[in-house]
């Protein structure tokens, strides 16, 4: 149940907020898509922690690249 709510919030962000800003994520998939996939696969606690760690690694000095949910 909590996982569905988290995914709903992430999808709302992807649909309504993200298009207002230029693309800036250095990773593929984007950080918000990574968060959706992590929560779907591991649940809101572990998936949320994985997503938070990913966002912390997404900064101008990061090399970025392909980083799928594993």
Curated annotation (Swiss-Prot):
Family annotation (Pfam families): YidD
Source domain of life: Bacteria
Topological type in the membrane: Peripheral membrane protein
GO cellular component: plasma membrane
Keywords: Cell membrane, Membrane
Signal peptide region: none
Presence of the UniProt keyword Membrane in the record: yes
Role played: Could be involved in insertion of integral membrane proteins into the membrane.
HAMAP family (UniProt xref): UPF0161_YidD
Protein name: Putative membrane protein insertion efficiency factor
């Amino acid at each position: 149940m909590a996982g569905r709510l988290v995914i709903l919030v992430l999808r709302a962000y992807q649909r309504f907020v993200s298009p207002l800003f230029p693309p800036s994520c250095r990773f593929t998939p984007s950080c918000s898509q990574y968060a959706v996939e992590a929560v779907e696969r591991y649940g809101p606690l572990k998936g949320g922690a994985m997503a938070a760690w990913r966002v912390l690694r997404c900064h101008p000095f990061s090399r970025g690249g392909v980083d799928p949910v594993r």
